[in-house]
Amino acid sequence: MPRTPADRLLTETVTAGPAWSVVLLLLDVGRSAAALALPALLASAVDAQTTGGDPGTVGRLAGLVAVLILLDIASLLVSPWHVNTLVLGLRRDLLGHVLRLGVRQRAVFSTGDLTTRLLTNTGEVASVVPLAAGWIGSLLMSGGALVALALIDWRLCVAFAAGAPIVTLIIRFFVGRASPLMTDYMTVQGSIAGRLTEVLTGLRSVRAAGAERREIDRVLADLPELHRAGRASWLLQGRLNLHASLVLPLIQVAVVATAGYTLLAGSLTPGQFTAATAYAGMAFGLFNQANAFMALAQARAGARRLAEVLTTGATTPGSRELPAGPGELAFRGVRGPGRYADLTIPGGAMVAVVGESGAGKSTLLMLAGRLLDPDEGEVLLDGVPLREVSERALAGAVSWAFERPAYLPGTIADAIGFGSGERVREAAELARADTFVRRLPAGYDTPCADAPLSGGERQRLGLARALARPARLLLLDDAVSSVDSVTELHISRALAAHPATRLVATHRASLAARADLVVWLDGAGVRAVAPHADLLGQDDYRGLFGAEREPIHV
């Protein structure tokens, strides 16, 4: 029974795609069987030449060599294809689990670290299948070679068995220390990749601050630790190869010397001596795999890193459908992160969420859209707890726009229509994006990668994407912070006419003034829920917006 999540993952990988795993195993077993038959036929051919035996033995020997070549070719074709299929499945499982992680669970792993796990560690884990098949083939070959040695002369088997326990202890000693070193190496590598991703994301800020050297030093701060772990693993592998290369030839010499003695004594024919020499080398095949054992240790280390992510609790979707409703949002006894107990957002209302930076505006929206689950209490949409709503129903009911919207590869139309494919141009017009999109070289068919967009234009496309979906709950997380005042006026008018419940996290007094209600947050949770005009009499509230003037309604 597998003892750890990593061992379970390796076992599941071996048993995934069982048909092709069996084919790969049969190819390795077939190669081992053919290899075992080769010395016997070679012995017959040698004896036939020296004693005038069956001349057809040479032809059978040539046929067996041809079979071995064909089996090798088939294995070289099947193994990479099957491994790549397993890698694809592991990457799909890992990426799917990451996408289901809550915000807090996801924050544990940096983007660069997850990229390393996704691109590198999955390949290392998938390699366990050909490793296992090859090891089983080697085991059968070694066992068959030992039986063949015993059948030729029992003393040959005794000579081999005298040194086998020593080799076993050497391999077990070194491999047991290799896996932790591999894990350390991969962990440090992931940490470096994470910091590199952060720097590349903020590259303009780094250059503007003249901080290139400082950031390079920060990214590579763990390089000595990476060097230490890598050097230790390579030294360990070198020592394993050294010890094996010292012990194995001595045992093989003992077997060959015993065979030579029995040949001189007349107990063996020249052909049997030739076969015994070949079988002695085959019997060591199981032990003479230092690189394979180190690869297995690397696969286990990769499995630990994948299992670390896969065993992190993901958001579990419910199974209920949402009833027809206006999009009323209710917080009941919600605690941690933030305190939003007994807060109700009326269906169809436009509600501004304001507060100082760090007060919990984004957290409130994440709870409302179930990107985050509360530690206590429930968040309900039209009377149904979000924990119980199915993934499909929730995706259809909630639409998002973010401060820094991300676009998938594709065209501008694809970016706006992502998730729905409907109302693309109408949504772009509502978000005041249609005009600048039409100026692009190919309009809505312009690839996102070829569209030089400002921060405000990107935000308008993100808002258009949110408006393109017929959702009952629209969540805008500082989604118009980079647009100019005139554009913001038109957007706020479009939002005011939208039938969905709109929850808008903002730092702008103009948006708060146009909302039906304002939810004012401080570090402890909800401080007040009231119209903007009712809150303006409080100095702390006015201070949230600095010197921004009240909007002129036109």
Where do the PLM segments sit?
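Transmembrane helices of ABC transporter permease
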Residues: 24-30, 37, 44, 133-184, ...
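C-terminal portion of ABC ATPase nucleotide-binding domains
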Residues: 508, 513-554
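An intracellular "coupling" helix at the cytosolic face of ABC transporter transmembrane type-1 domains
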Residues: 11-19, 103, 120-129, 180-181, ...
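Hydrophobic alpha-helical segments in the permease module
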Residues: 60-72, 164-166, 240-252, 270-294
